[in-house]
Amino acid sequence: MKILVVDDFSTMRRIVKNCLQEIGYTEIQEADDGNTALPMLQSGSFDFLITDWNMPGMPGLDLLKAVRADAKLAKMPVLMLTAEAKREQIIEAAQAGVSGYVIKPFTAATLKEKIDKILATKAAA
């Protein structure tokens, strides 16, 4: 499975990448914001998107909306990472079509649990 990790903070991208590798995912690419990520998603063959919420340029929610609006990408699973646990944000992300939500800080086990749940839901659809 090919995963794109999007976060403006390189240390956070590295943490996510290390967690993914720890749980068995090896095909991982990175982008530093939505403006960089969207063309990569459109031209690449990614299976899964993990994006931060708060980023300059194109924030995660805008990236999520762009992915859902693109016929080729619309069904791609999207996991949103954020330090914010505000109810309004969670609702906004759900309405925009997010597949799952992880609040920072998190462990590799939490990430695995969320990814497994999203993939199981996708397989059942």
Please annotate each region the language model reported.
Residues 28, 49, 101-102:
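Two-component signal transduction core modules
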Residues 17-18, 62, 85-100:
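Alpha4 helix (beta4-alpha4-beta5 surface) of REC/receiver domains from two-component response regulators
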